Design a protein with these regions (language model features):
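All-alpha prenyltransferase/terpene-synthase fold signal
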Residues: 1-169
């Protein structure tokens, strides 16, 4: 019985590795893309962070001998929690200080990742800031001061609050 559950848990983790890899490839192919839509962004974070949370919850339930309905419920919970976590993490990358984060603020911006706060701010400032976004995100031509400006535009556009609101829907 334990061996069967262990093999099932390994299968869950192997499948999660496949999905996460596909999510990473999708994110890499859409890096620097200011036209990334919200549905694709959510697909990326579902395939990466949320899949990891879901697989951990599901494998734990399998290992504990939970019944199929509990296993499914825990997997669904892990998926929702993973989406909420990643949305909040993406918002905090622009809305918090490095001290509060425990890591560098602005890493997503500096890596050219099209996260939801950035995408919302781009859409909300489209006409007047298009050249800035094109230079810093699409072309990757950033100065040390550009993160400060991007942060101001993102916060000023309400993108942080909108991203956190979406995060709360998933909890």
């Amino acid at each position: 019985m334990v061996e069967t559950d262990s093999m099932r848990a390994l299968g869950i983790l192997a499948e999660a590795s496949r999905v996460i890899s596909e999510g990473e490839v999708l994110q890499l192919t859409r890096a620097h893309d200011l036209n990334l839509d919200q549905a694709t962004y959510l697909q990326i974070i579902s395939a990466k962070t949320a899949e990891l949370f879901a697989a951990a919850a599901e494998a734990g339930a399998v290992g504990a001998g939970a019944d199929p309905s509990a296993i499914k419920a825990l997997r669904d919970y892990g998926m929702a929690l993973g989406i909420a976590f990643q949305l909040a993490d993406d918002a905090l990358d622009y809305g918090a200080t490095a001290e509060a984060l425990g890591k560098n603020a602005g890493d997503d911006f500096n890596e050219g990742k099209a996260t939801l706060p950035l995408l919302l701010a781009v859409a909300r400032t489209r006409g007047r800031e298009e050249a800035f976004w094109e230079r810093t995100v699409t072309k990757g031509e950033r100065t040390p001061e550009d993160f400060t400006r991007a942060r101001e535009l993102i916060i000023g556009s309400g993108a942080i609050g909108a991203t956190l609101d979406l995060s709360l829907i998933h909890i």
